[in-house]
């Protein structure tokens, strides 16, 4: 687009559609953080809380077997901030500059270490069939109940005037008389509860009545709710198999009103043999701004999985994989890992599990894969009005729903483009376009993308073509300012900051320009506070 006589290169200028080409604003020296190499290979981030409270921070690289550390300065007063580490938190800082992702939400910054594999807590030890229930559903004149337990048989016949309670009492006495070691039998309203402390209860059966249908026994599971007694022992957990399909079963726990046994109610619960959820030491950590100039790095208190098992309420897909980026969208906290996108419950950012194993609600977590015929490793995400634009090394995707509201049932991921891009430098949003880069061995190409919905390919332009080979491949930072309509690049091995600025009125682009600034020394990081 250059015309004869136009400027070939602009250093330390600032093109403006109103004032023309002016000098850039002057730099202000605020303070000295160290030598020119003190913070080399550190991950820098900028936090803007209010106009009067802003911070510049960095994560120093781990080296020589030692973990990294966090340093934060007040960007207004330049006071060094106090950093406190929660239990085991600093052990999470094992990476260097390119191994971290930082997402700030209000007073918290979510730090993700891309080197660490997310893990679940260990499955608890579960001893099957150490509890059992004998339930009678009918009694009549001289009803006979025949049962077996631990290879022993017993038989009880009721008298003319025996009640349910009397029949249960006789069955309890018959079992007690077998003298089975460490077996406790408790009589309740309509059943007997059996528990054994040192071994499984083997071969528990019972029949009753002329048609052998007036009594039944179960241990860790029942086929339907009808088999459950009206009372049980507190915290007694039973699996309801339902249709028999793995995804149709669920678990119920009995809650006694007095905390021991007797009257109470059943509530949905977690399988006793299943992990309670996420291992916080392997998950992203939070840097909390506790007060002015005070920060605490700590493990996040993730909400435990409360219901179901690995089939009906599975762990998020990132378990067993490395999380590459965190993001916030539609009132949900999300994570990228391999080819999957995992998002929290709506409004409950640290809850990655379903509320119930029996049904899916719109607020439940979302977990989808962007798999195609090509290998996919998602590394970046940009929220847009059409949904989430997902980026991998060679493909771009759009994750969204027809009505714009992301739910487990309605959300889909579709491929929208197939551009090669850099996986280290994240794309940025300028308000009207998304900019991303692609590197060659000697220079950097810059692209601008405008999404047009899930059913249309985006418009993509190579905006760096007019300055081909001008931006070196050594840049490591890309930022944007929607307010000032520019993007900027910097690298820790160069003094130059490279800018692209455009001005548009509607769809009519009035100004497009490339220029650079020369800093006094190599640029560690840049940020736009607008």
Describe each model-derived feature in a short phrase.
Residues 1-78, 224-377, 438-457:
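N-terminal beta-propeller domains
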Residues 118-130, 340-355, 394-405:
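Amphipathic alpha-helical scaffolding segments
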Residues 52-54, 106-107, 330-331, 385-386, ...:
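Short coil/turn segments that connect the beta-strands within blades of beta-propeller domains
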Residues 26-35, 82, 88-92, 311-315, ...:
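A short beta-strand motif characteristic of beta-propeller blades
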Residues 40, 105-106, 322, 329, ...:
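Repetitive beta-strand solenoid architecture
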Residues 340, 347, 369-530:
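Beta-sheet-dominated scaffold domains
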Residues 40-45, 52-54, 58-107, 113, ...:
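Extended, beta-strand-rich, solvent-exposed assembly scaffolds of outer structural proteins
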Residues 45-48, 100-104, 125, 182-187, ...:
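Short, exposed beta-strand/loop patches in secreted or surface proteins that constitute
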């Amino acid at each position: 687009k250059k015309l004869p006589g136009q400027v070939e290169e602009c250093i330390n200028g600032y093109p403006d559609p109103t004032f023309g080409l002016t000098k850039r604003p002057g730099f202000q020296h605020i303070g000295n953080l160290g030598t020119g190499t003190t913070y080399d290979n550190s991950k820098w981030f900028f936090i803007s809380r209010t106009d009067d409270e802003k911070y510049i921070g960095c994560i120093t690289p781990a080296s020589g077997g030692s973990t990294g550390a966090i340093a934060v300065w007040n960007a207004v007063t330049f006071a060094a901030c106090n950093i406190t580490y929660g239990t085991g938190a600093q052990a999470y800082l094992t990476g260097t500059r390119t191994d971290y992702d930082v997402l700030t939400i209000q007073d918290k910054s979510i730090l993700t270490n891309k080197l660490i594999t997310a893990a679940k807590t260990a499955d608890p030890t579960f001893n099957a069939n150490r509890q059992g229930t004998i339930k009678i559903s009918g009694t009549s004149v001289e009803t006979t109940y025949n049962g077996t337990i631990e290879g022993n048989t017993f038989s009880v016949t009721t008298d003319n005037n025996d009640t349910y309670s009397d029949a249960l009492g006789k069955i309890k006495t018959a079992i007690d008389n077998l003298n089975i070691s460490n077996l406790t039998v408790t009589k309740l309203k309509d059943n007997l509860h059996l528990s054994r402390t040192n071994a499984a209860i083997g071969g528990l059966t019972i029949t009753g009545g002329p048609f052998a249908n007036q009594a039944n026994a179960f241990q860790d599971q029942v086929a339907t709710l009808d088999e459950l007694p009206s009372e049980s022992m507190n915290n007694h957990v039973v699996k309801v198999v339902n249709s028999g399909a793995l995804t149709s079963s669920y678990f119920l726990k009995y809650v006694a009103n007095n905390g021991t046994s007797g009257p109470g109610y059943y509530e949905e619960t977690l399988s006793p043999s299943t992990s309670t959820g996420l291992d916080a030491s392997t998950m992203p950590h939070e840097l909390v701004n506790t007060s002015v100039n005070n920060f605490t790095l700590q493990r996040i208190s993730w909400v435990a999985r409360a219901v179901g098992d690995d089939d009906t309420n599975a762990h998020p897909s990132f378990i067993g994989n490395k999380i590459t980026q965190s993001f916030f969208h539609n009132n949900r906290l999300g994570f990228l890992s391999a080819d999957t996108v995992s998002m929290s419950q709506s409004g409950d950012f640290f809850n990655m599990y379903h509320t119930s194993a029996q049904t899916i609600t719109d607020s439940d977590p979302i977990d989808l894969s962007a798999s195609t015929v090509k290998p996919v490793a998602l590394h970046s995400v940009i929220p847009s009005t059409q949904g989430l634009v997902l980026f991998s090394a060679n493909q771009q995707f759009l994750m969204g729903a027809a009505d714009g509201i992301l739910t487990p049932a309605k959300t889909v991921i579709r491929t929208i483009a197939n551009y090669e891009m850099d996986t280290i430098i994240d794309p940025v949003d300028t308000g009207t376009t998304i900019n991303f880069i692609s590197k060659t061995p000697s220079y950097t190409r810059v692209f601008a993308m405008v999404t047009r919905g899930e059913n249309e390919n985006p418009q993509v332009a190579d905006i760096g073509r007019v300055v081909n080979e001008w931006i070196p491949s050594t840049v490591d930072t890309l930022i944007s300012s929607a307010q000032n309509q520019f993007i900027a690049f910097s690298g820790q091995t160069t003094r130059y900051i490279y800018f692209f600025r455009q001005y548009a009125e509607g769809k009519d682009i009035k100004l497009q320009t490339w220029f650079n600034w020369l800093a006094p020394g190599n640029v560690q990081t840049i940020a736009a506070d607008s």
